[in-house]
Amino acid sequence: MNIRQQLVQLLNLAMVLSTAFMFWKGLGLVTNSNSPIVVVLSGSMEPAFQRGDILFLWNRDKYVDIGDVVVYEVKGKPIPIVHRVLREHKVTNKDRKVRQLLLTKGDNNPTDDLSLYAHKSNYLDRDEDVLGTVKAYLPKVGYVTILITENKYAKLGLLGLMALSTLLTRE
Amino acid sequence: MSGITKPVNLYSVAELRNATDDALPLALSKLGYEQSFSLIDTKLAIGYVATILAGSLYYLEKKYNNDFSNLTYYYSMVALVVGYFALNGLLWLHGKYREKDIKYVGINKNNQKKISIEARVENNTTPIYKVTVIENNRLLGKQDIPFTGIFDEDGFIHIDQLVEIFTRLLQEKEK
């Protein structure tokens, strides 16, 4: 085997990984969301969404509506949360910029999300905290990623399989 | 030099084709040709530049914590994503219109003439190697080579037979 053939094989592997990554980033740019696809990790939105559902987000609407299901991330807590918008306020700043402030709640939770928000904050900021509104979903498919993130052997096994298959096939 | 020392599975057309593709440089070097790598090098260069773009975006994502409100990050992301897919498009065009089925490009050491060899198989159930030889953009000859003619029963390729076939193919034009 010569060096160019090996470089081609390595390139094929690199292309598989980089194309997946760049599609993800491209989708992020189109939807204007830095995490355009998320997997539901908790049961707090049952029966609307179950653990393992995949959600597709869209973040180009200027304001979100009451009743929309949004995904938000609280500063300092790296896990995105999927909950429904319960109330909203539009506040005009001194620089005449309108901010939309939100209160959210999980359909399956007994109380609203005040206790989940950042320290001393009693609202979410539409522009700063919300990753996007849920526009579509695929039920259960995301369970694979839950398995991978919560079980390190599943993760290693899958990575190994992917690497092997791209290195061994030459079609 | 895989495919020459290693037997292939005679029931797999893909393996037969790969082994024959791999044997072309050796066969043609025996006929006085020196292989030219410009096509594959172009492909490698475009591909690896694209990969570097993706890699640097990965680095930026970590550096800026994937914060879309940071405009430096946002616009470099736009540039890198657009650049990446442009290069991929280029790679696709290169494969479709320049590389096509070309498996070997070589230059004759004596008369400096450049030949390209296109080779393909019709499908995965027809064990016939369809070869087209082009010399300086002029069609030199076509031949369908059944794999039974160049592989023996044990799955070893016979370079001499391949050399013989190409000697005939390359001589035809000189008449």
Swiss-Prot record, chain A:
Ordered alphabetically, the record's keywords are: Endoplasmic reticulum, Hydrolase, Membrane, Protease, Signal-anchor, Transmembrane, Transmembrane helix
Q: Which residues lie on this side of the membrane: Lumenal?
A: 25-171
Any one cellular component term from GO for this entry? Answer: signal peptidase complex
Q: What stretches pass through the bilayer?
A: 7-24
Which species? Komagataella phaffii (strain GS115 / ATCC 20864)
Residue numbers on the Cytoplasmic membrane side: 1-6
Catalysed reaction equations from the record? Cleavage of hydrophobic, N-terminal signal or leader sequences from secreted and periplasmic proteins
This entry's Gene Ontology molecular function terms read: serine-type endopeptidase activity
Sum up the protein's function in the record's words.
Catalytic component of the signal peptidase complex (SPC) which catalyzes the cleavage of N-terminal signal sequences from nascent proteins as they are translocated into the lumen of the endoplasmic reticulum. Specifically cleaves N-terminal signal peptides that contain a hydrophobic alpha-helix (h-region) shorter than 18-20 amino acids.
Q: Where is the active site?
A: 44, 83, 113
Entry's InterPro entries? Answer: LexA/Signal_pep-like_sf, Pept_S26A_signal_pept_1_CS, Pept_S26A_signal_pept_1_Ser-AS, Peptidase_S26, Peptidase_S26B
Q: Sorted alphabetically, which PANTHER family does this protein's record hold? A: SIGNAL PEPTIDASE COMPLEX CATALYTIC SUBUNIT SEC11
Its gene is SEC11
**This protein is called what?**
Signal peptidase complex catalytic subunit SEC11
